[in-house]
Amino acid sequence: MRQNLKKVAQIKVDESKKLFPYVFRVKTSCGNCAKRSKPKLIYLLIFSLISSCFVFAPQLLCFPYPSALFLIDSSIKEIENRVSESNIESPKTSQKEESISCDRTGYRSDICFMKGDIRTHSPSSSIFLYTSNDLTTDQVLQEKIKPYTRKWETSIMETIPELKLVTKDMKLFGDKRKCEVIHEVPAVLFSTGGYTGNLYHEFNDGLIPLYITSKRFNKKVVFVIAEYHKWWEMKYGDVLSQLSDYSLIDFNKDKRTHCFKEAIVGLRIHGELTVDPSQMQDDGTTINEFRNVLDRAYRPRINRLDRLEEQRFHARLAQRRKAKRPKLALFSRTGSRGITNEDLMVKMAQRIGFDIEVLRPDRTTELAKIYRVLNSSKVMVGVHGAAMTHFLFMKPGSIFIQIIPLGTDWAAETYYGEPAKKLGLDYNGYKILPRESSLYEKYDKDDPILKDPNSITKKGWQFTKGIYLNDQKVRLDLHRFKKLLIDAYAKSIR
């Protein structure tokens, strides 16, 4: 049946000189001509019908569609689709391509590469590679991996479920799982567990490593996510759409057998909020290219917001453009590490000549709106914390001032200062003096907590967190901080 339909479909694309021999051809020597005569009569009738439609269509309207061939073509495609769905086979691969290899040399993460007949089985937290190679043992070959990028941090890695990558010899194991969904592009599987929920970790442990790992596929890749969160997809959907043309797969919830020719399990990570061009496989991609991804992701939404604002506040916007005052974006904190004299600092910055926009984002704040503010700002100011990750939204050449509380020097410089410089920002770290810390009122001036914070932080993370992160506020020496703002203003109006 399918062969006959393909012959009919050929009528549509063949030239007329090829059509007639095809329809009227009769074999002179045929031992079974009686059985063939009926199909050839059908061809003749169909051809006559099509020919009459081409000639008399304007008058007789043989079909309600632009062409009679539309119906034939649609029918053929429908039947062929049904046939392909009922006979699903995995993508064919050669023996040389069948392999599992893992790189466990990285300090921050493990990563495994699979090629061949790959099939997922989420109920057993497994991904199978069925091979036609003769294995040297009748035992199943297996790798285990936790696809999260904080390998060295034992406490958090204990919360990440382990995946099994299993090689099976098709000749020895008869439980080859039938493909329910076939993918023609590779998979990248990773976890959004761990510290997901903290902005810094969402970028550092997730999005940037995902970009590093998947970039070479040029969006022709499927993301398979362990510990999937719907809110995470909603929050970063605009960015993910710039990295993949395909829908996400919830590995734990989607019980179907997904089949791939290639898969990467785990992510590459180069460092804190950065892309190391020397480790990229292409032309030396940097963190600036990742920022370009963010710009493409948020640009459509920003353009819509700009149009809406212009319609509502046309006069005010015109006045602001005329003034041409540089914008300073201030990230405001409440609770620990908050600036107790923030209002006075804002007024001082306004007197210097800045337009001030105070940002108080929470988990529900739309990232495109924050990106819009920072992308149009000359200066970003904030106290050390996860919100400083937003420096990625600043244009290269912009000024980033990070206020560094006592005991946070190393973290502030490592997590935000150095990465900001790599992005091309003019980074300035403002290290507060003991008298600018609320701890000054709690401890004697000669106490190591004030006099030698390094001796305290060396005792471990719990001391750093308990004293310097959770129990400290900042009261800026405005005269001292003013010098930094004046310098930033001078640079921003050049």
UniProtKB/Swiss-Prot annotation:
The keyword DNA repair does not apply. One of its GO terms (cellular component) is Golgi apparatus. Residues 1-40 are cytoplasmic. GO terms for molecular function: 1,4-beta-D-xylan synthase activity. Keywords: Cell wall biogenesis/degradation, Glycoprotein, Glycosyltransferase, Golgi apparatus, Membrane, Signal-anchor, Transferase, Transmembrane, Transmembrane helix. It is a single-pass type II membrane protein. The chain crosses the membrane at residues 41-61. Its EC number is 2.4.-.-. Disruption phenotype: Reduced amount and altered composition of seed coat mucilage. It is an enzyme of class 2 (transferase). InterPro entries: Glyco_transf_61_cat (IPR049625), Glycosyltransferase_61 (IPR007657). PANTHER family: GLYCOSYLTRANSFERASE, XYLAN GLYCOSYLTRANSFERASE MUCI21. Belongs to the glycosyltransferase 61 family. Glycosyletransferase required for the proper composition and structural properties of released seed coat mucilage. Required for the production of highly branched xylan polymers in seed coat mucilage. Facilitates the addition of xylose residues directly to the xylan backbone. Xylan with xylose side chains seems to be necessary for pectin attachment to the seed surface. Essential for xylan synthesis in seed coat epidermal (SCE) cells. This is Xylan glycosyltransferase MUCI21. The lineage of its organism: Eukaryota, Viridiplantae, Streptophyta, Embryophyta, Tracheophyta. The gene is MUCI21.
